[in-house]
Amino acid sequence: MSGDAAAEQAAEYVPEKVKKAEKKLEENPYDLDAWSILIREAQNQPIDKARKTYERLVAQFPSSGRFWKLYIEAEIKAKNYDKVEKLFQRCLMKVLHIDLWKCYLSYVRETKGKLPSYKEKMAQAYDFALDKIGMEIMSYQIWVDYINFLKGVEAVGSYAENQRITAVRRVYQRGCVNPMINIEQLWRDYNKYEEGINIHLAKKMIEDRSRDYMNARRVAKEYETVMKGLDRNAPSVPPQNTPQEAQQVDMWKKYIQWEKSNPLRTEDQTLITKRVMFAYEQCLLVLGHHPDIWYEAAQYLEQSSKLLAEKGDMNNAKLFSDEAANIYERAISTLLKKNMLLYFAYADYEESRMKYEKVHSIYNRLLAIEDIDPTLVYIQYMKFARRAEGIKSGRMIFKKAREDARTRHHVYVTAALMEYYCSKDKSVAFKIFELGLKKYGDIPEYVLAYIDYLSHLNEDNNTRVLFERVLTSGSLPPEKSGEIWARFLAFESNIGDLASILKVEKRRFTAFREEYEGKETALLVDRYKFMDLYPCSASELKALGYKDVSRAKLAAIIPDPVVAPSIVPVLKDEVDRKPEYPKPDTQQMIPFQPRHLAPPGLHPVPGGVFPVPPAAVVLMKLLPPPICFQGPFVQVDELMEIFRRCKIPNTVEEAVRIITGGAPELAVEGNGPVESSAVLTKAVKRPNEDSDEDEEKGAVVPPVHDIYRARQQKRIR
């Protein structure tokens, strides 16, 4: 029993690094470093134990061909072929990854070889693969493997032989016009194949295909260039907003744009669309969490569908139209289940195709997700219902929205304005606003929307009554009423007399006495400002302690990528405009206090030594320590003096003259000039040299084994 317990405990043992990885994944399910640890651990475990990890992996990254391949290879290794085929059924059609498809072909080749129908199944597998992944730039090996497979098929009789030749030729001809790496080699193999069958017929066959091949070869080079730098094995993760990610997104979009530019210069719109959609599919394997890629892919299919319909190709037009809907469906069913943007675009697309029932199902599907804010969904749903089925249908959606506890005040504003603009009945809109005020009277945004509506109707008395009700009812907390008071003051400034303006100002100051104590003048600014015009300069506003409540709030709610309006007005005075120059970071500076007689190897200024770069640190660790070098040591001063006095010749003739001590003598022998064997009678002396000084300092003696001089001596003997 103790042995069994120990074995069970050992089986349940979890390494510390795996525990840390699991903890990281709880914080961030897309942490690739943590997943790498789990993958390595799973690869060292039996498949029955590792299968759970692999399932989690492909569930988290359903578009990663690399992870699917790891899972499948683990099952193949364990000879679980029934599970392998189910895995291929789950991923093969959705993940057009070249390595995954090569794995599929290898699996069919190795496991179906003994079946009687092996040849038919293998040929079908190759045709299926080339149809789906044949446009891949790295698909050369699949084409070659298919051709070699067909060549190896046994053919008995002339009819079977002709069939085999036709099949091989068909694959060669398809491949030679398909842009990919190594297309030149495929073309050379095709030429040899045709010449081996019939050398007389080969010339015509090759000439017929030569033009298309040259076009494909040109495109293949462009294809290779545009694909360079793309990280095609990266798993799809939510946008990280890093420079590296932005660069990859830009490169993917350039590749897609290149395919849209029709580099093959074909008039076949179907072929162009297929190539562009293949580019989108490759992009979505990596950028599947980016909604813009899904939307642009669907838009392109919709445009292609309309173009083909105009040309009369109704079958392909309908095919592409349905495929556009399928793109939206895939997006909201897999990686972007909560992305409202794609739901709304999908609904609008189906609305354009007059499929209203489908639109209802799309909106209801989104509303069924519990952990979302359904307010915007109801708003768009109401607008669709009003457009497609009339105002009564819109009211039914509004009723449904009111019953949903998750809904916020925006739905009431939308419903009221829809009634006002569409049914032209301001009394119904008024009732909806009043109904919403009972529920959302403590939300200043709702109150302001109601005020805007009444101002639009130019009903001064009702507007003033609403201000008084909201500000005196106590439903709105004082800290939230700042913008309401500012709007009340603006309202009185536009239509009231001076007495009413002063009265509102006084009441406002009383409400915010603690905040504006000693800053009464700051409140005066709101009386005279208009839109972005202010009665003081920016520096004066700052000195007054003025805060623009509306603009501060606007800046807070606008997302970071959008540039929010400045809280202070744009200044017109040139005096206040100060030029912005790049300035050094003075916080990082250190005082210049050099050491006296600094030891060798130390920086003269304390703290002035910068850390060695990481690459140099690695190199320094690999090098032996300084004590290992005992010499010889170079006399740097003397070496530099030799370089300084060395005269470098500008021409070959001058170099020969310096070496030989005179001009080269040429003798014509046979068919060309041959250098004469002039004997050097004295040592070569450099110009501008003083022999006496050299003797005093010690002449530079040439090395004993000077190969160059030895060769020169052999030449002149």
From Swiss-Prot:
Which SUPFAM superfamilies does the record associate with it?
A: TPR-like
User: Does the UniProt entry include the keyword Signal?
Assistant: no
Q: Can you name this protein? A: Cleavage stimulation factor subunit 3
Which GO cellular component terms, listed alphabetically, does the Swiss-Prot or TrEMBL entry include? mRNA cleavage stimulating factor complex; nucleoplasm
Q: Which residues carry this modification: Phosphoserine?
A: S691
Q: Which residue ranges are recorded for the region named Disordered?
A: 683-704
One Gene Ontology term of the biological-process aspect is: co-transcriptional mRNA 3'-end processing, cleavage and polyadenylation pathway
Stretches forming HAT repeats: 45-77, 79-110, 117-152, 163-196, 221-261, 271-303, 319-352, 354-387, 458-494
List N-acetylserine occurrences by residue: S2
UniProt function note = One of the multiple factors required for polyadenylation and 3'-end cleavage of mammalian pre-mRNAs.
> Where does the protein principally reside?
nucleus
Source organism per UniProt: Mus musculus
What keywords tag this UniProt record? Acetylation, mRNA processing, Nucleus, Phosphoprotein, Repeat
Subcellular localization(s) per the UniProt record: Nucleus
Give the multimer and partner information. Answer: Homodimer. The CSTF complex is composed of CSTF1 (50 kDa subunit), CSTF2 (64 kDa subunit) and CSTF3 (77 kDa subunit). CSTF3 directly interacts with CSTF1 and CSTF2. Interacts with FIP1L1.
Q: Pfam family example for this protein? A: Suf
